[in-house]
Amino acid sequence: MRGYLLEFATIFTETLLFIMPYIHSLSATELASNSQKKVIVGMSGGVDSSVSAYILLQQGYQVEGLFMKNWEEDDNDEYCAAADDLKDAQAVADKLGIVLHQINFAAEYWDNVFEYFLEEYKSGRTPNPDIMCNKEIKFKAFLEFAAEELEADYIATGHYVRRREVDGHWQMLRGMDDNKDQSYFLYTLGEQHVGQTLFPIGDIEKPQVREIAQEQGLITHDKKDSTGICFIGERKFTDFLSQYLPAQPGVIETPEGQEIGQHQGLMYHTLGQRKGLMIGGMKEFGDDPWYVVDKDMARNVLIVGQGADHPRLYSNGLIANQLHWVDRTGPTSPMKCSVKTRYRQEDIACTLTPEPDGNVRVMFDEPQKAVTPGQSAVFYLNEVCLGGGIIESYIR
């Protein structure tokens, strides 16, 4: 018996020492205060939300989970596998001893995310539905449901971002893990959303998240990260999009106006794209690969150029609209900051200038490649995410 107790004490101590750097040392007063707060964790069936729930329990909160189903397409292993995700979320909830609620937001997702996705592609732009999903579903529908129906004090998610209160105002900061920082996807949050949301793994790196999950015996510890767009799943993008938008074939031209091929629809192509153009083997043009360098929407023409450094792939700046600022005010005069025009991109030094029409003009310190209308431009001041907007056009 003594040996068993000694072994148990050793394991408990090792586990405690392992997780303490990631959950922070809390005073008795803080633990007592947290025990009066109810937190609803958005649980997706992945490792990040699983560990988020675990950490919040260690911090003394009253924790419950919520599984959201946002798409009504047939779920099976080939597509979104929502049934498997729910099963994993329930297994984690059972392991942690917490309640798991379920909610269907498919109607809200269709109206506010998917229809936007289709309209943008119909216009020849390249949208990011994950950003719209965060804005309309996770930090609107979910937040409202948790507060009104489940009487939550906070919601929590497994996003790799941090928050900080300064002079009574909430800031959103990049996640500590540079490889996983997700502030790019959350720039539409206002400071009131940031104040109502806990991000338990924002100051942890992904390998440590998996280690914590494994130490605690959570079934999701080795589950692959979700990638791509859930409602498309493993299907070919062109096959999926053609179910909802009619193809509009047109010609492919060089920047000089020479016709060299046919495309099936501008919506299937994005700036900087190399694969899938079906225009190889033309000896008179040499061996350099072709890239999409522009779209002429008025003529329904796809413009391609040769070489990864073709001049028309580069822009000196951009115009952004549909702006969201975390502090809800934004800059009123030109400012130096940095911008990302796509996820996991290195910061681009720039000058941001508010325009009279409500847009912003962004000029890069150095020319940038494949700035794509429809994508988001997200602005930073050191580690603080200021906000962002949709790229309306590029400046060459």
UniProtKB/Swiss-Prot annotation:
Biological role stated in the UniProt entry: Catalyzes the 2-thiolation of uridine at the wobble position (U34) of tRNA, leading to the formation of s(2)U34.
Family recorded in the similarity comment: Belongs to the MnmA/TRMU family.
Descriptive protein name: tRNA-specific 2-thiouridylase MnmA
Enzyme class: transferase
Reaction catalysed by this enzyme: S-sulfanyl-L-cysteinyl-[protein] + uridine(34) in tRNA + AH2 + ATP = 2-thiouridine(34) in tRNA + L-cysteinyl-[protein] + A + AMP + diphosphate + H(+)
Pfam family, one: tRNA_Me_trans_M
A GO molecular-function annotation: tRNA binding
Coiled-coil regions, chain positions: none
Residues annotated as catalytic: 133, 230
Keyword line: ATP-binding, Cytoplasm, Disulfide bond, Nucleotide-binding, RNA-binding, Transferase, tRNA processing, tRNA-binding
Residue numbers binding ATP: 42-49, 68, 158
Disulfide pairings: 133-230
Highest taxon listed in the record's lineage: Bacteria
Gene this protein is translated from: mnmA
UniProt site positions, description: Interaction with tRNA: 159, 375
Region feature (Interaction with tRNA): 180-182, 342-343
